[in-house]
């Protein structure tokens, strides 16, 4: 979901208005994806690097999370959308954490599309956490001091998307908006064999017609 800031700059409005427009685009894409029968949709909402932005912008983004849950929860449940969070959202402000907890609880019974929201997420950070979690688990199961090779399957299982967590498949397609042609630390392990699509369209203007 890239291009909110540039969208706002082009219109001479505050960056937070761009993020608000981006949230409206996300609403459209989520429901459209569900209606199209897409089984898994993952969006990059807030990266581990986004903390470097201004306090005002970061705070505004977190307030939008609360706003999104309040306005969209009923429709998500109605459309049988199941929510997963990729990343450590416990570091967010309390009101955002409570809203996300409610979102997860209210949609845990839903069996339709998996809507996966990457929050405080970084691809490298995810891999490091997965390896550390794996090694900690091994110390419990194998005992201290026992060494054996780590496998791809074990790392995959310990990722946020892995079988020990959300258990969602690797993406078939990764779409990057705003004209940038790089992954920017998004699903680095999982997208090894994904098709990549780059579009100049800024995220707030993106629609299902481009898919």
Where on the chain are the PLM-derived regions?
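Flexible, compositionally biased loop and terminal segments
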Residues: 1-211
